[in-house]
């Protein structure tokens, strides 16, 4: 088992529907620890920079627009195999295809407004964490 860190964002739809606590509880029940967190209203520059990898794809403008509609909760999660564990808890990108009991099956409405974002690989997690957090803002947790 590998101790990893991953970035998780609770998106504007889930924040607006007051699902922050329920989503965090699922991460913690799965053994993931929050080692950094902040609520932030993304502006266009923030969203475009974070999702720059998708620039030029048909959904880019809608994604950037959606991510700036309200505040988001941004967290660094830490735990054994945190990246894959987080992705399992989130469920498939399309909530209609997400397994029952996953965050997206329970809280997302559409593939565009799908409640959460999670890093997909170790390299991506590192880049995404550094986009939102300085290293001194990430707190190691021993217990």
Swiss-Prot record:
UniProt cross-references to InterPro entries, sorted A to Z: NDK-like_dom, NDK-like_dom_sf, Nucleoside_diP_kinase
Enzyme Commission (EC) number: 2.7.4.6
Record-annotated active site: 117 (pros-phosphohistidine intermediate)
Gene3D superfamilies: Nucleoside diphosphate kinase-like domain
Keywords in alphabetical order: ATP-binding, Cytoplasm, Kinase, Magnesium, Metal-binding, Nucleotide metabolism, Nucleotide-binding, Phosphoprotein, Transferase
Superkingdom of the source species: Bacteria
Binding site for ATP: 11, 59, 87, 93, 104, 114
Keyword NADP: no
Primary location group: cytoplasm
GO biological process: CTP biosynthetic process; GTP biosynthetic process; UTP biosynthetic process
Gene Ontology CC annotations of this record: cytoplasm
Cofactor(s) required for function per UniProt: Mg(2+)
Summary of the function given for this chain in its UniProt record: Major role in the synthesis of nucleoside triphosphates other than ATP. The ATP gamma phosphate is transferred to the NDP beta phosphate via a ping-pong mechanism, using a phosphorylated active-site intermediate.
Family: Belongs to the NDK family.
Protein name per Swiss-Prot or TrEMBL: Nucleoside diphosphate kinase 2
Source organism of this protein record: Protochlamydia amoebophila (strain UWE25)
Upper taxonomic lineage: Bacteria, Pseudomonadati, Chlamydiota, Chlamydiia, Parachlamydiales
């Amino acid at each position: 088992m590998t101790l990893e860190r991953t970035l998780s964002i609770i998106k504007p739809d889930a924040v607006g529907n007051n699902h922050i606590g329920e989503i965090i509880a699922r991460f913690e029940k799965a053994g993931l620890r929050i080692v950094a967190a902040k609520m932030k209203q993304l502006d266009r520059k923030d969203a475009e920079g974070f999702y720059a990898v998708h620039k030029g794809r048909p959904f880019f403008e809608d994604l950037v627009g959606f991510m700036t509609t309200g505040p988001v909760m941004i967290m660094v999660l830490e735990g054994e195999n945190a990246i894959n564990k987080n992705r399992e808890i989130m469920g498939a990108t399309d909530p209609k295809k997400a397994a029952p009991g996953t965050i997206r099956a329970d809280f997302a409405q559409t593939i565009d407004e799908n409640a959460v974002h999670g890093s997909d690989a170790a390299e991506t997690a590192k880049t995404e964490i550094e986009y939102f957090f300085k290293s001194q803002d990430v707190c190691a947790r021993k217990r």
